[in-house]
């Protein structure tokens, strides 16, 4: 039976890790064992932060909507409640976009919501 040497696969694996570690500082970019540790940690951070990013953006959208709503005399909670009463189904991402880039349209939306809130109370 022929002897199997694993030089080719080992070299390929090392190359793959060192390619992923490109741009790292110090020996983390050139020494396989250290690069492997740094790459594994980087992948853990990436996995975690893909989930964190969703939370961060939702928070950012809420902050922007709240700021824009308060300029028109409503709080975020009252504004969102008014949207529900008015039957307007816009998500927070779109509302934040409107609040930042389409201020006139957002103002009209606040007027509509204010009317619905006045009717309900």
Curated annotation (Swiss-Prot):
Gene Ontology MF term list: rRNA binding; structural constituent of ribosome
Keyword line: Ribonucleoprotein, Ribosomal protein, RNA-binding, rRNA-binding
Keyword Transmembrane helix: no
Keyword Isomerase appears in the UniProt entry: no
Listed name of the protein: Large ribosomal subunit protein bL20
Any single GO CC term annotated in Swiss-Prot or TrEMBL for this entry: ribonucleoprotein complex
SUPFAM superfamilies in UniProt: Ribosomal protein L20
Gene that encodes it: rplT
Any Pfam family matching the protein: Ribosomal_L20
CDD domains: Ribosomal_L20
Function, in words: Binds directly to 23S ribosomal RNA and is necessary for the in vitro assembly process of the 50S ribosomal subunit. It is not involved in the protein synthesizing functions of that subunit.
Family to which the UniProt record says this protein belongs: Belongs to the bacterial ribosomal protein bL20 family.
Example GO BP: ribosomal large subunit assembly
Higher taxonomy: Bacteria, Pseudomonadati, Pseudomonadota, Alphaproteobacteria, Rickettsiales
Superkingdom field: Bacteria
């Amino acid at each position: 039976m022929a002897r199997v040497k694993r030089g080719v696969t080992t070299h390929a694996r090392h190359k793959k890790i060192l390619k992923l570690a490109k741009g790292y500082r110090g020996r983390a970019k050139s020494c396989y064992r250290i690069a492997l540790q740094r790459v594994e940690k980087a992948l853990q951070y990436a996995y975690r932060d893909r989930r964190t990013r969703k939370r961060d953006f939702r928070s950012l959208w809420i902050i922007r909507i709240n700021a824009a709503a308060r300029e028109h005399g409503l709080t975020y909670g009252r504004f969102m409640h008014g949207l529900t009463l008015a039957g307007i189904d816009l998500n927070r991402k779109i509302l934040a976009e409107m609040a930042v880039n389409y201020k006139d349209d957002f103002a009209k939306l606040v007027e509509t919501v204010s009317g619905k809130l006045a009717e309900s109370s």
